Curated annotation (Swiss-Prot):
Protein name: DNA polymerase III subunit alpha
Quaternary state and interactors: DNA polymerase III contains a core (composed of alpha, epsilon and theta chains) that associates with a tau subunit. This core dimerizes to form the PolIII' complex. PolIII' associates with the gamma complex (composed of gamma, delta, delta', psi and chi chains) and with the beta chain to form the complete DNA polymerase III complex.
Physiological role: DNA polymerase III is a complex, multichain enzyme responsible for most of the replicative synthesis in bacteria. This DNA polymerase also exhibits 3' to 5' exonuclease activity. The alpha chain is the DNA polymerase.
Entry's Gene Ontology BP terms: DNA replication
Primary site of residence: cytoplasm
GO cellular component: cytoplasm
Family that this chain belongs to: Belongs to the DNA polymerase type-C family. DnaE subfamily.
Keywords: Cytoplasm, DNA replication, DNA-directed DNA polymerase, Nucleotidyltransferase, Transferase
EC assignment: 2.7.7.7
Top-level taxonomy: Bacteria, Thermotogati, Thermotogota, Thermotogae, Thermotogales
Top-level EC class as recorded in UniProt: transferase
Originating gene: dnaE
Alphabetized SMART domains for the sequence: POLIIIAc (SM00481)
Molecular function, one GO term: DNA-directed DNA polymerase activity
Amino acid sequence: MIPWVISPYSFDGSVVRFEKLALLLKRKGLKSVILADRNFHAAVKFNTIMRKHGLIPVHGLWKDGRIFVARNREEFDSLVRYYNGETHEIEDIPVFQESELTPVRYLDASEKKASIFMRKIFGLDEDVQGFPEKCEDVADILNAEAYDLRVNHRFPTPPKNWNELLIKKAEPLGEEYISRLKRELEVIKRKGFTPYIYTVEKVVEIAKKMGIKVGPGRGSAVGSLVAYLCGITEVDPIKYDLLFERFLNEERQEPPDIDVDVEDRRRKDLIKELSKSFQVYQVSTFGNLTEKSLKNLINSVLPDASLEEKNEIYKTVYGLPHHPSVHAAGVVISENPLPLPTRTEEDIPITDYDMYDLQEIGVVKIDILGLKTLSFIKDFKKEIFDYSDEKTYHLISKGKTLGVFQLEGLQARKLCRRISPRNMDELSILLALNRPGPLRSGLDVMFSNSKNVPAFFRKMFPETRGVLIYQEQIMRLAMFAGLSGTEADILRRAIAKKEREKMEPLLEKMKKGLLEKGMENAEQILEILLNFSSYAFNKSHSVAYAHITYQTAYLKAHHLEEFFKLYFAYNSSDAGKIFLAVQELRNEGYRVHPPDINISGKDLVFHGKDVYLPLTVVKGVGVTLVEQIEKIRPVSSVRELQERVTGVPRNVVESLITAGAFDKLYENRKLALEELNKRVEKDILEIRSLFGEKVEQESSNIKIGDITELEEKSMGFPLTPVHEVPTGLFARIDDVFTYGRILPVLVKRVSRNIVTDGLSVCRVRTDVPDGVHLVLLSPLQKIIKIWPFNENTRFVYRVDFTATLEKAGQNEITEVLKNGAVVRYEGYRPLTDEYRYRVVPR
């Protein structure tokens, strides 16, 4: 009996894990087994693990009821060509009928139920078999041999004068650039990475020729002058004091990583164009069921199984592949065709192997990532930016960063106000600090108030006020203490991975170097380095992405209306983002109206200071329906819309009405709904009457509180402020959401969980009593505290003397403690949320 293993990558119920399989074979005294799937997804994993255990991996292909088996590498490559459709026949290779072999989908009896469960979720029968007790060794029968699956991957070859061309580019920049460039080129050449970097250069060059926007750079590659002069990156590494050794050094064995960001909607176009010049392959990836979804699936497929059985199935199945997919970024580019198993999608081959398999067999992928923000920027058709624009930095420093790359979150907005960046260096620092680790450790507070930072660090790293924020600073400190650039990068990585055996000799060398330089506090310096190194960020990446952040902020600061038009176009299906955009438009002084059936289209419409929401914010309204409506406009009634736009569902018309799209045609929304209800199809009424069904007209009574509830139902957010509330006394609802701040707001209840300040309206998570109240409102839509309101109510902030103040409502007061005395500022509030408060009178 010859076993034939089917892997989970056939997606037909197998739960075989290769490590367990290898141990089973050794226990049984076998030295080989056949793996034959309908694809080659598992081939590299199987090959690697079997050979690691000293076993012979016998590869096969399961096709048309037969098992084709490769005895050696030559036959394996023949199988791959047959699988790829490059040949239609395969000769001189062992072939078995399915019935001649024992298909193995599990390894021991405890896994059988898990295998049956997997068969069920793939819609297959319950016929599964395990590993037979007695079996023959297939390697002996077939005289099969062990072999690896490595391939000869060659990147395109650069022209012979490639180095000289780069040196010519550096000559006008001065001796510092020429010297560094030559050093970088020498390391790249010795490591054999010149073709790799040249290939990435060609990718970027082709993208730019196609008019595709490419990002300024990503990751440690931004620290390379070679990458900058090739046009791969757009950030001068010498200007920003970036280290090449962070990208590549003599000790590094694997190729460096150069990832390329391009506008997301053109990524496929670029890959197709690249395939005209090179051999291009996309990369497979595999989706797994999440813990929650797997448990739900087990409960629904096996409702009667015991808890013990369910837990056993869960343990057996968790982590197994559920479906194949295509890697979002990875692309293999080669000078020569590669003997890889592939499937084809949109004329581009996709290798069956995932990124880890490719790495194992010597194939290096390049990540080409589609970035939506680059498409957004491209739509402005602006290529040159002034990176010293005060208006842009002011916008960021206020935390007015909806739609600004990497700064939309509440923590990011708070950090914007704390750091208040005034230049690109400080903006880069802001991005580096905007991560959970640095924020938890208080690095942002230390940076903004750097009094307690040792003088040595303040002098050495003035740009970060002496605070260790970047990985490159750790390397600079190590190099200052006598380590080479290569040693400094090894130390950085060893600290990050907590590899003590690598760290300790380098730290000892650092200590000695610091003492030789007269640093008596060498121990303290090393202690600070170790404490902060785990929070340090890649400066090269931070500087590059700061350019994208700045560009989006600049466009918002100088082209507000166009910015919001595009923001709505890119986010029309995200009600939460549209709600925030509405708040910010109101904060900018615009009157925001519901979608209008005769004015609105698929984009935001500006008429002076009046703004009309797109029809596409209404649920169920897509671009096709909008185009139909635009063709028949003007529309004079609900009835006309139904008569002239064929097939528009009644519930969509109702959503348009409750969203306010017919407000200019009817005195109120109740009347529009009444007309809709009168238009119930006559033939449906007649059919129902024929069968004696009682037909009732739907009620169209709308109370004042229902308006916002119905808007929320039809658009995902409430819009219309239906009550008047005194204004100008405190902050506004739109202040809270525009700046992402916790602020005092005067509100009136609209319905159970909806409030208005007379200018805006929002849902809150707290039930507010009837009447007007002062509330402390959070941008998370929580009311932190409620106070009854009268005309004498004042909200008093208490801050220390370092706080920056801004204009506020007339009933807001800030008390600043200066030299032991309290100074009061009426009509002002602190710019940051670090304040104590009280309300008077209560």
